[in-house]
């Protein structure tokens, strides 16, 4: 059915970079040259979900990329722990898979994610008092979009002020295809990062190797 609807996969393809020569690859040779890593065992998914207990490993049934693949397994951490891991990865020039609730307080023209972008409370004459935990529990917020977390702006004390992600909506959207998020927005609407294990503390890695991760649902 996939071949009928999408076409037969190519056996080779040509890959070229700006100011570089084109080179022909098979999918396997491309993987070996540009990745060369064990994508299954070399990474760990980290979640910030304050509605569930921190420092526990969770597994979601039937949330996988292929029928015979593994369920999503993640370690739930406080936001500050995730920030430390993300900063360590970025300082080592290693970008990360990142997911968030991208539609909240997004100014797409400026490419800015900031809870202070819009003053809904003054406009509506009310207050919105739910915190992140309550928004998750009432399904008012959740992970809706994945991007590449690639940069962070730190103050003199080494604390993050804002973050940059590379998006997939084209170069005319946001700042040349990128979005900037304030650290305040990161706290409220960031949900997942996938980091290489070498940036993750041993105490966090030890939580992955339990025999029966907790089912959150």
PLM regions: where:
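Short, exposed beta-strand "edge-strand" segments with a Pro/Gly-rich flavor and a Y/T-containing core
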Residues: 17-25, 70-77, 173-181
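Cell-envelope/ECM-targeting effectors and their regulatory/trafficking segments
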Residues: 12-19, 110, 152, 202-203
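Single conserved hydrophobic/aromatic residue that forms the stacking wall/gate
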Residues: 208-217
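Long, positively charged binding patches that form subdomain-scale interaction surfaces
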Residues: 66-147
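C-terminal soluble interaction/assembly domains
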Residues: 128-206
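Aromatic-residue-lined binding/catalytic grooves and analogous aromatic/hydrophobic interfacial grooves
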Residues: 1-62
